[in-house]
Regions:
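RNase H-like nuclease fold core
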Residues: 1-51, 55, 62-68, 140, ...
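RNase H catalytic domain
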Residues: 11-17, 58-137, 146
Length: 158
């Protein structure tokens, strides 16, 4: 099983009703020691920062063409705590309901679970805007996508 590092970030302008984007950087080193990288990003007309954080992780995992060991780095506690604190398991058990009502962004959580399924994923939180080079790079990809001209429609925004 190949080892991959996935760095992700999401951004939204005027959260929750403004444009947003995500950025992701995949890195892996092949058997010759050569580092390979792939950047992913997209922007949306109207979305939220949490949806873009999830989309960054989804895009990165969906870009993998075989099962991998993945270290996923995100500055989103919403994303990392859902897995590291076991929230996602409780949400699924309770049919996507919490004590305070339905879980938000069910469409993306379900898609993320499908994308994660063939891989072994470790979710790692990094402090945002604290000088971590790859987090900063993903932030730049996300904000550039949000500010771009070719914005997509986020069908899951209500």
């Amino acid at each position: 099983m190949g080892k991959v590092m996935l760095f992700t970030d999401g951004a939204a302008r005027g959260n929750p009703d403004g444009p947003g984007g995500y950025g992701a950087v995949l890195q892996f080193t092949d058997s010759t020691g050569t580092l390979h990288e792939k950047e992913l990003s997209a922007g949306y007309v109207r979305t939220t920062n949490n949806r873009m954080e999830l989309m960054a992780a989804i895009a990165g995992l969906e870009a993998l063409n075989r099962p991998c060991e993945v270290e996923l780095y995100s500055d989103s506690k919403y994303l990392t705590d859902a897995f590291n604190q076991g929230w996602i398991d409780k949400w699924v058990e309770n049919n996507w309901k919490r004590k305070t009502g339905p879980v938000k962004n069910i469409d993306l959580w379900e898609r993320l679970l499908r994308a994660k399924n063939p891989h072994r994923v470790k979710f790692c939180w990094v402090k945002g805007h604290a000088g971590h080079p790859l987090n900063e790079r993903c932030d730049k990809l996300a904000t550039s996508a949000a500010d771009g001209d070719n914005l997509l429609v986020d069908e899951g925004v209500t």
